[in-house]
Amino acid sequence: MARTILRARRFFSLILPFFFISSVYAEQTSVPAKTVTVEAKNETFAPQHPDQYLSWKATSEQSTREDALAEDPRLVILWAGYPFSRDYNKPRGHAYAVTDVRETLRTGAPKNAEDGPLPMACWSCKSPDVARLIQKDGEDGYFHGKWARGGPEIVNALGCADCHNTASDDFAKGKPALTLSRPYAERAMETIGKPFDKASRFDQQSMVCGQCHVEYYFDGKNKAVKFPWDEGTKVEDMEKYYDAIAFSDWTNPLSKTPMLKAQHPEYETWSVGIHGKNNVTCIDCHMPKVQNAEGKLYTDHKIGNPFDNFAQTCANCHTQDKASLQKVVAERKQAIHDLKIKVEDQLVHAHFEAKAAWDAGATEAEMKPILDDIRHAQWRWDLAIASHGIHMHAPDEGLRMLGGAMDKAADARTKLVRLLGSKGITHEIPLPDISTKEKAQKAIGLNMQQINAEKQDFIKTVIPQWEDQARKNGLLSQ
């Protein structure tokens, strides 16, 4: 019976159009406090929702850390001058959201609330404490200051109040009570013509995930989170927006290119894929309905690979067996990986060739069109590869973006050959040894021994202080 209901649901979802409508960007405003305080401690809701809580807690089983820089040292060069060149791991379970942002080398080793390289905004997708602080202090109050300021406050891992209105009557009655707990996400959805309160249940399910699984940047003096969707959500649309406001995340010190760093744009890429176009939501594939020991259906909150729950996910729509579908997905993943590596090789050469051109006396006017090509090439590459599931969500779009990146990188290198030739340089520009993460980091001047030592000291001394303070203030369970 359950499968019949799911198949009927899928039939009706397939006939619903999926579209985006442009609208005017709503300016950021401070959010007045609501009457009921956001409860950030996830275990508070365990007695009322035991199956959901225990399955959410099981995301702690997804504990493996995979070092993406060690797997692909080219990334170090592409992100030279940016914290991602120090440390970049593939994602793991939601239970580790706070732990991982604390322990990554990207957040530095701040000694006090005013110290460190990154802003408060870097907490924004990690914890229901973010929603609590925005409710308490407004967005301006929350975003103000350095990342370390939030250490004693943001202590509970991504959980219940991030996605559910836990103070509502509906939630108390066992209903999902989905909500957008981040006001900036709500504004972004309105920008593309999708106000949450008017959205279908299907759309709301993916919009909730889209609070975090999106491209965003840090805007203005307060470094507030904003989604760059004013022109649309495709790679070219967001590029147009960023170029119009002359935004860059950082400047690569090798090529001196003002760069863009993509985050994790699953919402944007999913929406143009076959599943998104047919209203197959994040929930359908990553949080299926399963049965508990008493035979009662509930939503599995151990978010993970759909193939791990094949009968409850893929098999609701597909007639192929698991092995057949895994083969299709593996082939798509390999195709994207192969093109990804080819693009990276071109971009690595482009950054070093641009450095050689500067060293040979190239002018800003001569370099401007080349740097534009490098910027636009790496942006397309990054948006494609930053969405780790693009081979499943939108493989055609992934290949399209990577193909565009290859074209732009080739344009940059063609112009560089001509420019270098005009400076009397006709030999191939040599690359340093970047065959390992360590060698690549040395090539861009990182003192990893010092960086790692400082981080370990921070983990041993500062984080325990944060947790002690949080417990004293009642923000963590004892």
Swiss-Prot record:
Q: Where does heme c 4 bind?
A: C282, C285, H286, H393
What reaction(s) does this enzyme catalyze?
6 Fe(III)-[cytochrome c] + NH4(+) + 2 H2O = 6 Fe(II)-[cytochrome c] + nitrite + 8 H(+)
Quote the record's binding site residues for heme c 3: H94, C209, C212, H213
Q: In which pathway does it act?
A: Nitrogen metabolism; nitrate reduction (assimilation)
Q: What is its EC number?
A: 1.7.2.2
The residues the record assigns to binding substrate are: Y216, H264
Which positions does UniProt annotate for heme binding?
C122, C125, K126
The record ties this protein, via CDD domains, to: NrfA-like
Q: Bound how, and how many: what does the cofactor note say?
A: Binds 1 Ca(2+) ion per monomer. Binds 5 heme c groups covalently per monomer.
Which PANTHER family has this protein been placed in?
Answer: CYTOCHROME C-552, CYTOCHROME C-552 RESPIRATORY NITRITE REDUCTASE
Q: What is this protein called?
A: Cytochrome c-552
What is the species listed in this Swiss-Prot or TrEMBL entry? Citrobacter koseri (strain ATCC BAA-895 / CDC 4225-83 / SGSC4696)
